[in-house]
């Protein structure tokens, strides 16, 4: 799993971006967040995640709050 920091996340639209440790950004969709209840992330929050190749490129999967 990789570590990263939430760059921004729009809870209304259900997606955002995580900055990877190498400086690249990766797309994150709320459905990839591993938590109960309302699935959202906060700007600046530390997370761990896997990276999968989606239809539009790299995207985060199995996102867990650190």
From Swiss-Prot:
GO terms for molecular function: DNA binding; nucleic acid binding. Its main location: cytoplasm. GO terms for biological process: regulation of gene expression. Residues 4-63 form the CSD domain. The keyword Transcription applies. The keyword DNA-binding applies. It holds the Pfam family CSD. CDD domains: CSP_CDS (cd04458). SUPFAM superfamilies: Nucleic acid-binding proteins. It is found in: Cytoplasm. Induction: In response to low temperature. InterPro entries: Cold_shock_CspA, Cold_shock_domain, CSD, CSD_CS, CSP_DNA-bd, NA-bd_OB-fold. Keywords: Activator, Cytoplasm, DNA-binding, Stress response, Transcription, Transcription regulation. GO terms for cellular component: cytoplasm. PANTHER family: COLD SHOCK DOMAIN CONTAINING PROTEINS. This is Cold shock protein CspC. The lineage of its organism: Bacteria, Bacillati, Bacillota, Bacilli, Bacillales.
